[in-house]
Amino acid sequence: MSGSLHDVKNEVWMKTVVIAIGLLFTGLLAYGVLAGGVGSVKHSEWEDAHHELENSEMAWNVANESGTVAEQNAAEKVWEDAHHVDVDAHLSYLTWSTAGKTIMVMFIVYAAFYGVAGFFNSIQSEEEHHEGDDHEEHHGSASPILMAGGILLFMMGFPGFVVTCKAWLGLDYEPNMTGFMLSSVGTIILIMGIGNWWREDLKGYPEQIATSHPFKGQDIRKAGMWIFLISEMMVFATFFSSYLRMRTGWCTQWAVDAGKCEVVDTTTASDLLRHDVMTLLPGAINTFALIISSYTIVLALKAAKNVNWKKSENALMARLFPSRKKAVRNYLLITIALGSLFIVLKLVEWSHLIAEGFTIDSQAGSIFFVTTGAHGLHVFIGLLVMLFMVFKADTVGYDEKNGQGIEYFGLYWHFVDLAWVAIFPAFYLY
């Protein structure tokens, strides 16, 4: 994401520290209110409901041993009601607890990444922040190599990293410190690569144009983005083809209802989600959130490239978008908020499915969680990139000369949105 040449004062980086601390405080506050506050109340309600369930089960057992048929039926009805209350109380607790924990972790990561931008730019001298026309040519960057190397090391050590984290959480696993350290080193190198990329990008270099076939005359990074998106299409096509191939061999409730088989042998996520508005609601909200976020990223690009931008005559809009620079920043912030909502609701939904016994251990569960998890990871990576874009919009700013950065990211974000529009009906409704 290229930028034009600007004079960025060193005191600007102090603002990033304050914002990072604010993000960290917001995440901890959300955890305290949602998970620690409301979550604790919901947990107490769940414990009470579970106690009532145990009592009703004992009464049902007694009725089965010595009671009449009428008493047995009455006891069974009481147990069923208590069971429904217990399940609802458990899911309510998971909703608040998972939301609080997710927001806390997300905002800690946000604070770290936003702080990285300030750190890597604050170590530059004032002269480096302001480069003249003689230094406009960009001679290449080590950032892609650093980021690729960091990702490689992280993935090499990832199995050991997961096992070690499980061991530290008290589960019955032996820590694998070799894998954990390998992933940790990879993470550090990845962050260094990202920080160096941000430092280089903020200075701004002219957009490089391809000089040979087949992309002659085209912006190099735009062509690169399209090639990257083609590879991403192949990744998600693999998920879809696996799901559709296996789905044809499953006897699901949908297949039974259609008369294609007689006995259900596989429960899919859609079997648990599509029959009730409340269970389907998180996925539906996420669909609209991503569609709206595609619109807001376009508005950010439009504001950046509109040389005749004028403040709205509407009082509310004028207050939200008082200047062209702040309009770009605020549209990006709205996009981040919508994407963050997607991640929170996704993990809340996951917690409900796991609580109901739909886990990654089953074939249907593995396809569902891997596909939606991979998509969620793409959303989260996009949110981290947008953090830098917000940082840049708030400092040097975007305009008609450097707005292609938003345009290229917008291509990625639209792809992520379109992927979800395909995932939602296939995995939630079918």
Q: Where are the language model's segments positioned?
A:
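...captures the hydrophobic TM-helix bundle architecture rather than a specific catalytic motif
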Residues: 2-68, 76-430
